[in-house]
Amino acid sequence: MTPTPGEADLTNTPAPRARRSVLSRGSWSETARIAGILRKETVGGAVLLVASAVALVWANSPWAESYFALRDLKIGAEPFGLHLNLTLGTWAADGLLAVFFLVVGLELKREFVAGDLRDPARAALPMAAAVGGMVVPALIFVAVTAPVGDGATRGWAIPTATDIAFAVAVLAVISTHLPAALRTFLLTLAVVDDLLAVTVIAVFYTDEINLTALGLSIVPLALFALCVQRRIRSWWLLLPLGVATWVLMHESGVHATVAGVLLGFTVPVLRSVAAGGPEAGPGLAEHFEHRLRPLSAGVAVPVFAFFAAGVAIGGVSGLTRALSDPITLGIILGLVVGKPVGIFLTTRVLTAVTRANLDDALRWIDVFGVALLAGIGFTVSLLIGDLAYGLGSDRDDFVKVGVLTGSLVAALIAAVLLRVRNRHYRAVWLQETADTDRDGVPDVYQSQRD
């Protein structure tokens, strides 16, 4: 029928495009994988908290001297002129944390090759949010410490890191049923945070470089890469190559934990065609991650925390002095205010710019709660504090007080916010776990089954 004058012809009017949703639920395979990672990190987080508490109590007990004597005990040698006569605290920071960063490297590569970060549309939000969560706390720290002078701003990167083990331990304590999309967002944020942290450590906290040692480190790294590309799993071969890479990287002046990330990057995520292709099963990266994550979360990080978290507070007067220092204040404000505000505002702005909608199951208060969890910076923050001001220095002690206080405050505020929303989270969780046909895949993922 021909429309009369004044009437619009609606027959050929295109339907309005549906707005894209951000922080929506991912695939079942990715959700299940992330749930498994977070379960392991929860146990690691509990061990981390215990190790930190023991260090704090010991460092402020009548036996404090024995704690610091143990931390500063030198073990090692200097074969072939290599500087490997290190204190236990340094072995923990440079050596054990290399295992942690090896797992980070494996996780990063998997995310970029087969995880959420392989899709530019899905990767843009957490990557931008992580950058925002790095820039804002760094600016706050610099603004607070700049008037002090004397290199106080050197620790600008301290409040920029997220400790995923600590964060998921908080979630376990408050017993919240965080939706899968928020868990994925938190883990992806932490993964990108770790990538940024490694970059910052390598670029900004390397004073002098021994180019010969750095060049030589490429040899065992390349041999390691050759072996894993050929799917060689023999630890009697891979371990010496990994250790040699670490030793030469340490000797070069670049922080040795960078070696862990580079080794992780060389491991293939997907099976080659010769090995049966991607459908033949998990790649070597997943195999290594499965073996190494318990060692990283249950041993490497807690031992580092034990040696890094011990600070002699000196009673009420000492605590007051530490809390009034600009370095401590800059860290606390960076973690509690800068980190969540940076993540939240970046997420909000990017959502508005791309004309997307927040997923129907979520509210912006949920995003802010997760952003507060990202303000729990512990392991990497303490490591950067050691690099910025020197292990055992007065400023390093202020760093420890700031990181511990800021992380605790961020955790408490996040716990309150997320706990208030827990009834809604539980309803979402029941929907996400309902499996009426008992085939092992929840009903909401049936259309995405892969």
Swiss-Prot record:
Pfam families from the UniProt entry: Na_H_antiport_1 (PF06965)
Domain of life: Bacteria
GO molecular function term, any single one: sodium:proton antiporter activity
Main location: membrane
Catalytic activity: Na(+)(in) + 2 H(+)(out) = Na(+)(out) + 2 H(+)(in)
Keyword Transmembrane appears in the UniProt entry: yes
Record flagged with keyword Transport: yes
Name of the featured protein: Na(+)/H(+) antiporter NhaA 2
Organism (species): Mycobacterium sp. (strain KMS)
